[in-house]
């Protein structure tokens, strides 16, 4: 089945499961991958296809506290995941290929391993793969809402209640075992992170961004990974080591090079996009990744493109872009942003 949804001179958008769509793309056709897969256990993006049951039914999964309690008593943890994929009113089954709703962490990690294996095939030998992942905590089964709780029945027995699960590093180490070089592990610090209601731990204010490559010799434009040096005026250097007399630093200091390496802690505020119900992803993040890790006139791929922020960054930097998503309405948002009907640089979403 043809997955192509939109195409212009530099943009190509596909609708479908990331793994299946990538299998149809030619090998060594992508120079850079920048992506943020749906985080495990965070939310349901509503991509299920209902089969059977009553077509007039307003389908609902069995996710009330009572249903969870009774299901827990009657079935094993593996079977519970399939029970919760049936409509509690008419019995229709929900078939869903979205990522992030896997029954266990191991299943989530394994699916990202499969996706990354296909990315390996698509990447050129010197290509770069930038993978943004968020961690989560293990909780008891309680409450309802659009944000799905990660329960103790869904995590390995060694992860205790309230424990941080280490999902980003579970994925990174799995990919390392599969041949990827984990070249960097950036901390994306979010100064304006959403308030955390927890009262017995510190608030979470960061996500991980991994730089993965196929070989030691890969494309990396170090000049695009620099930030300005501090002021070189004499008054800013009076208290240098060895003396504090102003006359000892009268002449300006001329730095070597254009700046210093930005390091592996990136402080970038989130900028939610009003029209897209997906995780905030500021355009500054893919811009830096693409500027540093994609050849000039190269091609960028985002297999979980959402509202297309990576695509906007690619276009602004003169690269072509391929995006994949299960939801065509997210592609529609991206197209509107390309056409200038929505802001392209203020409010961004992955």
Where would I find each of the regions flagged by the language model?
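S-adenosyl-L-methionine-dependent nucleic acid methyltransferase catalytic domains
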Residues: 1-217, 224, 231-350
């Amino acid at each position: 089945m043809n997955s192509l949804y939109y195409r212009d001179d530099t943009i190509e958008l596909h609708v479908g499961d990331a793994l299946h769509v990538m299998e149809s793309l030619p090998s060594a056709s992508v120079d850079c991958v920048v992506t943020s897969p749906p985080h495990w256990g965070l939310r349901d993006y509503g991509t299920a296809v209902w089969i059977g049951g009553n077509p007039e039914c307003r389908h609902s999964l069995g996710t009330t506290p009572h249903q969870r309690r009774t299901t827990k008593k009657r079935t094993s943890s593996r079977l519970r995941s399939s029970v919760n994929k049936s409509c509690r009113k008419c019995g229709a089954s929900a078939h869903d290929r979205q990522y992030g709703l896997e029954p266990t962490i191991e299943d989530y990690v394994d699916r990202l391993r499969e996706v990354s294996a296909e990315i390996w095939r698509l990447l050129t030998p010197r290509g770069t793969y930038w993978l943004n992942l968020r961690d989560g905590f293990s909780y008891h089964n309680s409450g309802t809402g659009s944000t799905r709780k990660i329960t103790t029945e869904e995590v390995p027995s060694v992860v205790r209640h309230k424990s941080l699960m280490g999902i980003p590093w579970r994925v990174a180490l799995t990919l390392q075992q599969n041949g990827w070089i984990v070249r960097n592990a950036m901390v994306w610090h979010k100064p304006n992170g959403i308030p955390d209601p927890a009262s017995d731990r510190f608030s979470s204010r960061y996500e991980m961004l991994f730089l993965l490559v196929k070989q030691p010799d890969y494309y990396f434009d170090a000049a695009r990974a620099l930030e300005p040096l501090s002021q070189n005026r004499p008054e800013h250097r009076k208290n240098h080591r060895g003396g504090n007399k102003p006359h000892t630093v009268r002449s300006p200091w001329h730095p070597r090079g254009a700046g210093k390496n930005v390091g592996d802690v990136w402080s970038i505020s989130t900028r939610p996009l009003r029209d897209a119900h997906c995780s905030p992803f500021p355009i500054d993040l893919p811009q830096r990744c693409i500027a540093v890790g994609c050849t000039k006139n190269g091609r960028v791929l985002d297999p979980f493109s959402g509202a297309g922020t990576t695509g906007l960054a690619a276009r602004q930097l003169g690269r072509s872009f391929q995006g994949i998503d299960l939801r065509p309405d997210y592609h529609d948002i991206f197209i509107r942003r390309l056409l200038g009907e929505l802001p392209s640089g203020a409010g961004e979403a992955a």
